[in-house]
């Protein structure tokens, strides 16, 4: 005897399951409040404002303004256990993490300014109170290891030196959300992925 399948019934059940799953996800995302309760609250607010369109937002936490840089611990553990960094490279990274711009991971002159500018190696040396030749040596070594990318910029007319910016690989230190690494930053370090294939964590 041939079994027959009622595809309409199966499809209907699948839609019901999807709807229930969406409702459950909504509750989880809104601290146990379901869609119907939210809609009722919106209707009450709309009546209270004379039928005007309602927008609900959450107040930003004061902590959201706090600047931070995350050290990817498992990768640091691997690097230290395998002598990936020299002592002066480690010290350099520890000292410059305070200059990392949020999301871009660029070494800048002021992390609190919206108009922050990338720091040159001379400026970094001045801030760290050391000589430029030492910073240049460390930076070049970290570029070879894929930890730093030196991105060349525009060369103004009449100026001999080309502007550039230094970016730190987010797989080592990242000033931003680990689950949302900037696309541009990923592209900068795409060619360095092979150098980190033995590291335990890859953010992209």
Curated annotation (Swiss-Prot):
The keyword Zinc does not apply. Keywords: Plasmid. Possibly involved in pGI2 replication mechanism. This is Uncharacterized 23.6 kDa protein. GO terms for molecular function: DNA-binding transcription factor activity. It comes from Bacillus thuringiensis.
